[in-house]
Amino acid sequence: VKDTVIILNPAARGARAQRVRSELEKLARGSVLCATATAGEAEHLARNAALEGYGRIVAAGGDGTINEIVNGIAGHDVALGVLPLGTMNVFATELGLPAGIGACWKIIQQNRTHRVDLPRATRKHFVQLAGVGLDAQAVKETSRSFKRNFGPLSYLISAVQIA
């Protein structure tokens, strides 16, 4: 079994993405680091890593990145690690993970795992929630730049604009 692949969503930290990437390269020596360039790419990278025999795939991004990776590794015997870099980091918060990359990396290195349910809606799996209606539309229509400018408040503002 190969060890670890880290899938980084560089958009998750905006202008600080290069600094985050450098920090990950120092922390995770010996791991394979892949950065996504397009939406949906994390799922493809995760599936390929699972098929190549990697035992641990780390999502370095937000809840959207985690969701893509979960869909790539579903059905494979692979552990998911989380480095919360997104706007809300709901899944990481639900797991009680610390906010810092270094602290989360230590947890990953210690192989501390927690089983979670992997429900499925239509053809996609999800780990923390599935929304329909206003909440789903607000998440879908909140742009990357809006999230960068307003952070977690961006979703509330989008929901108010839609309603």
Give the label of every model feature segment.
Residues G14, G64-I66, N89, G133:
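Glycine-rich nucleotide phosphate-binding loop and flanking beta-alpha elements
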Residues T65-H76:
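Short Gly/Thr/Asp-enriched flexible loops that form oxyanion-binding sites at enzyme active sites
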Residues R16, V70, F91:
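Active-site-proximal flexible loops/turns
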Residues P10, A60-G62, L85:
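Glycine-rich beta-strand-to-loop/alpha-helix junction loops that act as flexible
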Residues V5-I7, K26, T36, L51, ...:
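Catalytic core of DAGKc-family lipid kinases
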Residues V1-I57, N67, G102-A103:
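ATP/NTP phosphate-donor binding region
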